[in-house]
A protein has these predicted regions:
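Glycine- (often His-adjacent) and acidic-residue-rich active-site loop
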Residues: 35, 56-90, 109
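C-terminal alpha-helix plus adjacent terminal tail
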Residues: 1-13, 22, 45-47, 59, ...
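Terminal peptide-recognition signature
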Residues: 18, 36, 54, 67, ...
Length: 253
């Protein structure tokens, strides 16, 4: 599967729709991370765009987080850190993108998928969009995404999600600010996304850009923070515990 197939973008009437796909639960590989980062960088400096809609393909999960297929292959610290930093770099690029990002969350979000939604400025979810931070179950932790999740939903929600690794329903996500709205059907989801995107496409771009700055002010030191968190994740993913649990997951697929 080529880079052009896993991430696509389309611009229409000042709305840029970025879509990603992975047949394995819309999980994110290095290729996904790099391509998505490039797309958000390009969008940021395009004056013909007012708003970005982020979506994924298929009827299953919205995002399964980091690709297990990649995590299980790491045997060197440098490569592992490079992957986790790339994940954090994508989220940093999203919050520094000058245009508001609206997430269309049609299904479950797991692990890094929660970080992805947290880095968006508005999220509309379908009732099936349950959520779970599963990192502890594989011997690591949600270190790289933690600043974004805490900023979006608060330390209380983050501690609940990270320590109790059970599923939460979409209403839980809404109550803690991760989702802005929860709807019942795909039709309602598309209608709500279209209405909001259409409205934002007509607003003053300079006003939208200033609002985006305010949403994510005081995050200037996050690149260093992400680098430190990526190092923690890289060391843990190479541990015997993590390796054994990842191998077990792969074996059950």
């Amino acid at each position: 599967m080529s880079a052009n197939e896993i991430v696509t973008s389309e611009i229409q009437d000042k709305v840029c729709t970025i879509s990603f796909f992975n047949p394995k639960g819309n999980s994110l590989s290095t290729l996904h991370l790099l391509r998505l980062t490039k797309e958000f960088n390009d969008v940021s400096y395009n004056d013909g765009i007012n708003v970005v809609v982020l979506k994924s393909s298929g009827d299953g999960a919205f995002c399964g987080g980091a690709s297990i297929d990649e995590l299980v292959k790491f045997d060197r610290f440098e490569k592992a850190k490079e992957f986790f930093f790339a994940f954090g770099k994508l989220l940093l690029t999203m919050i520094r993108c000058q245009k508001p990002i609206v997430a269309r969350v049609h299904g479950k979000i797991v692990g890094g998928g929660i970080g992805l939604v947290s880095a968006c400025d508005y999220a509309i979810a379908k009732k099936e969009a349950s959520l779970r931070l599963s990192e502890l179950t594989i011997g690591i932790g949600p270190f790289v995404i933690s600043p974004f999740v805490i900023r979006k939903s608060g330390i209380s929600a983050f501690s609940h999600l990270s320590l109790d690794t059970q599923w939460r329903d979409a209403e839980w996500g809404k109550n803690f600010g991760l989702y802005s709205k929860v709807v019942d059907t795909n039709e309602e989801l598309d209608q709500e996304i279209k209405k909001l995107a259409d409205d934002l496409s007509k607003f003053n771009l300079n006003s939208l850009m200033k609002l985006k700055e305010i949403f994510w002010e005081k995050t200037e030191n996050w690149e260093q923070l992400i680098d430190e968190r990526a190092e923690i994740s890289a060391r843990l993913i190479l541990s015997e515990i993590a390796s054994g649990r990842l191998q077990k997951i792969i074996g059950n697929q």
